[in-house]
Amino acid sequence: MNRNICKTALLNGGSISPLILPDNPNGTGTCNPSIIKIKDKTYVVIRHVQYALYHSEFDQNFHSPYGQLVYLNPEDDISLTTNNYLGELNLETFELTNVKRIDTSTFDKKPIWEFVGLEDARLINWNDNLLISGVRRDTTENGQGRMEISSIKDHKEISRDRIEIEKDTYCEKNWMPILDRPYEYVKWCTPTEIVKVDPLTNVAKTIVLKDQKVDFSRDQRGGSQVVRYQDYWVAITHEVDLWFSEQNNKDSEYYHRIIVWDNDWNIVSHSKEFKFMDAQIEFCCGLHIDDSGVYITFGFQDNAAHVLKMPHNVFENLAGLSNEELNDLNLHLLNDNQITSFLDTYVIDPRNANRNFYVGIEYYNLKQYAAAMSYFLRAAELSTDDKLIYEYLLLVAKCIQVIGKRDNTELELLNNAVRFDPKRPEGYLMLSLYYERLRQYSTSLSYAKIGLLMKDNDLIRNSIYGDHKDIIDYQGSYKLDFQIALCNWSLGQSDLSRKQFKDLFYSDKDLCVDYFNLIHKNITDLSPFPYINYDSNKQNDLIYKFKGYEKINKNFSQCLQDIFVLTMLDGETNGTYLEIGSSDPYIGN
């Protein structure tokens, strides 16, 4: 089986590019894009989900708290909510422009099931109209799924039709629209069933039902649109294995095939099962073919969207339409002029931990945190370097922290790193910061102290290096000292906290600018206690004795600011003194 047709394409003149959602809400998953060309414009629709898919692959050493495969939803909203974004794609540069969320507000109703929105939309051009068609499951209390067709204009849904069928079934999904035959879909592949939707009644009726001589090991389920190629109809289907672990946690493996039909809808050729980029979960919703090549859009682990350009000869070879020999898949290097995106070096060697890590860094810097998490987790599962595995696991937790609203998951993922190597301080700092954020100061203080015990175990090993240093944000043990001083203040240890901040400020530790300023601010804000008050015993200490100074028996200003004003005004009387931001009139005024 070819586990990496993207590599096949790259080694034979193809290219791949990420489809980046510019304004990705919270950095959660983007997936399952579709593609269509109408006149001189090529459109792409990208599915955006509010979850991040966590999938521990390979040896599955690092499960989430809910198993090896799970949707990490906001913990205050477990619905699987989808929104769709429409943009225009330049097929030469892969530049994605004019990307906006499709406005569906005209037809939306309050969802009554947990799968919300139109899922896995395929783009369609029927009669020069831009349409999307996917499954919606939020209109019934039991999640009944039906395909829908929506017309889109200027990023707004202007019509929505729900397709009914003659038989009462629970879930209809992944129908493949036939692009040159309006309102027709391939509903099943073996046997091949084609339905046609009456646009007046929105009822789909079977118009073709053909047994096939080919026998596949798994059901062929819908994927891309069905498009014309030479004298054939072609589409990319998906198939899946589903199982449960010994702990009764679900897992799955997705595969794809190219299916080729003749004009009478006989399957005359097909590819072997394949994967796009060697992940267990991938999904294809888009196929466009023109003179410049074959364009396939697909999702990676529900967290990232991609477009693959494949030369015609590669497509024909995979589909069984040609026996032309292709370049060797065992190559692991590209020439510099062959590298067009940060994905290329990964695609050439997808089980290289470092390459997974660097793709994760690229996605993180693009604020695509769910995608970054996928690659950091793969890096952790693949690496043989314990130091790096620890750091990759911290990066996984960091992605969930930045996405937000997943506190319980974040805690468990941090502990994945700590249990892997409990002798390193970085994880304890992140745990201390975690509990401080939750105002659990005693727990935060405890983890900071544990971290300090680990700081000298191995200074070389504990040195975070490379592009992820600023993400993990551990530049030295002084951050643990800071956490201890901060938590002591919130736990009522005022004098101790002041001393700890002061000791840290005057220490020889190499403080970063942000922490230097933060420590200085805390020293100023927390102030000395008892306060520096003035009383008549200090008269002789006044450098400038203003008029009437001898009348002052006591003044409660925190740091002599009242005395300063009188000094500057030479004891002026009968005026008004306004202090903005004052405290108690006698303590800490």
Question: Residues of each region from the PLM?
Answer:
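Structural motif corresponding to the intra-repeat A-B loop/turn of tetratricopeptide repeats
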Residues: 366, 403-404, 438, 491, ...
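Start-of-helix register in tetratricopeptide repeats
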Residues: 354, 387-391, 426, 479, ...
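SAM cofactor-binding core of SAM-dependent methyltransferases
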Residues: 554-589
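"A position-specific structural signal for the A-helix of alpha-solenoid helical repeats
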Residues: 358, 395, 430, 483, ...
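Short coil turns that delineate tetratricopeptide repeat
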Residues: 350-351, 384-387, 422, 456, ...
